[in-house]
Regions:
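Metal-dependent phosphoester/phosphodiester hydrolase catalytic core
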Residues: 1-458
Length: 458
């Protein structure tokens, strides 16, 4: 059984004990404990051990540290990114592993938001790759990462692989985390009815998605199965009076990827789905936090293609459909949401995302848009964390985005050796309420910085 002892002092002399769940093969020996009721705005030091169910013998301890959420106004800093171990780029011992996790840890964040693609279940890790300029990329390898994930244990093995990395383990021990998922937790661009390629012996995407979801929920640092019985991933994280984070699930409720030009809303044009969309509207309207960060696993206005359909029409993976006119397809849900935010006078919303494997800052304005019933807002893109770099993607003008900054590689699928790996940092000043977003590279060097003034009524 998991045993957690925590204290506000590093000595742990007056530690409080919380017993968690039992680690067993049924959940790949993952376990969790609910540390509710922590004192606010405190450094929390903890010790984790496992107690043998029969003998009572305790394992060697593992220590960690976190800062609890604030109760009063105060400075907040967090980091976000996505896309871990993609395109065959795994843990490279020649460069010391996934160093970007140490760069994020050294920013001393209050928490980390993983915007999805926490693993690449469809991306095996070979022993070596030849990359740009003839350079050699070496990987640590495991059996689970030798092929695409199909069995439950192979999906679990993708998460175990990432934990081999010393930078990831130290980061996990020091930084609280919020995870969401995207496509690669299952397979590339998955949606209902997806046709799997020849690497797969399991041909049913629904079977893969069910196994992938179980593995994600076992390894994600979040509370267990919720009232819906299916481990709902979308949720709100309240972080003091200055910040609410609205974590979306843009994967579980979508219709099949298509030309995305449906003239009316419906199951085929769903992206968030009606229940999640209603939840988001309700939670945004009820939020009293100054800043409302919408954590999306995909960008709004970037065109993300997914090949062609049976009729040779472009098929789309994200929200945008390449048509700069009025909202159609999945864009209709976003139009409904943006209209609601405007009419309800909900201020100070900022969108954070990843997915496209380069960093960018986008500013959406109705004066440039085909759909104009919304207030201007910012969207920031981070990633990748340890994967091939791509981009930049073309914009879709429906919601009037403009590129204020972007940094992408000179060629697609550039390796991490080239340096095009990015994370974002958000800082909220406790006195002024100003929110500042900084995009940083794998060494933590700032590439772009944007302060945003709060709206007084927000």
């Amino acid at each position: 059984r998991l045993r957690v002892e925590w204290d506000t002092r590093p000595s742990l002399r007056q530690a409080r004990r919380v017993d968690g769940t039992t680690a067993s093969a049924a959940h790949d020996f993952t376990a969790r404990a609910d540390l509710s009721g922590l004192p606010r705005n405190q450094d929390i030091f903890y010790r984790v051990r496992f107690e043998d169910a029969d003998s009572g013998v305790l394992s060697a301890p593992v220590h960690g540290h976190l800062r609890s959420a604030p109760q009063a106004r105060g400075d907040v800093r967090f980091v976000w990114s996505g896309d871990t171990v993609g395109q065959g780029f795994g843990i490279n011992p020649d460069i010391g592993g996934m160093r970007i996790y140490s760069a994020m840890r050294e920013r001393n964040p209050d928490f980390f938001l993983h915007s999805g693609d926490t693993i690449y279940a469809d991306s095996p890790i070979p022993a070596a790759l030849t990359v740009e300029d003839g350079k050699r990329w070496r990987n640590l390898t495991t059996a689970a990462k030798s092929k695409v994930a199909e069995t439950l244990d192979e999906f679990r093995g993708n998460y175990r692989y990432n934990l081999i990395d010393e930078h990831v383990r130290r980061f996990n021990a020091e930084v609280p985390q919020i995870w969401q998922w995207d496509d690669h937790e299952t397979t590339n661009n998955w949606s209902p009815g997806k046709q799997l390629d020849a690497r797969y012996h399991v041909r049913d995407i629904d079977v893969l998605a069910k196994r992938a979801r179980q593995a994600f929920l076992e390894y994600a640092p979040m509370r267990g199965v919720r009232a819906d019985g299916n481990g709902r991933i979308y949720r709100k994280i309240a972080y003091g009076p200055l910040l609410d984070v609205f974590v979306l699930d843009m994967r579980s409720y979508r219709g099949a990827n298509s030309d995305n030009l449906q003239p009316q809303p419906g199951p085929d044009a769903a992206f968030l789905g009606p229940e999640q969309l209603a939840w988001l509207q309700r939670e945004l309207a009820g939020s009293r936090a100054q800043w409302k960060v919408i954590a999306a696993d995909m960008p709004i206005g970037l065109q993300v293609p997914d090949g062609e359909d049976a009729n040779g029409r472009p098929r789309w993976e994200a929200i945008a459909n390449g048509d700069p006119g009025a909202p159609r397809g999945r864009e209709q849900e976003i139009a409904t949401l943006l209209r609601f935010i405007s009419r309800a006078r909900i201020r100070n919303t900022v969108w954070l995302t990843a997915d496209v494997h380069y960093c960018a800052a986008h500013y959406y304005h109705p004066d440039r848009a085909a759909f104009q019933e919304f207030e201007p807002f910012w969207e920031f893109v981070g990633g990748p964390l340890n994967a091939g770099s791509f981009g930049p993607n073309a914009l879709d003008a429906t919601f009037g985005p403009s590129v204020m900054f972007q940094k992408a590689p000179p060629a697609p699928n550039t390796s991490p050796l080239a340096g095009y790996q990015f994370f974002g940092e958000v800082e909220i000043d406790g006195r002024s309420g100003v929110l500042t977003v900084t995009l940083r590279d794998l060494d933590g060097v700032a590439q772009f910085r944007q302060p945003i003034l709060p709206h007084a009524a927000g």
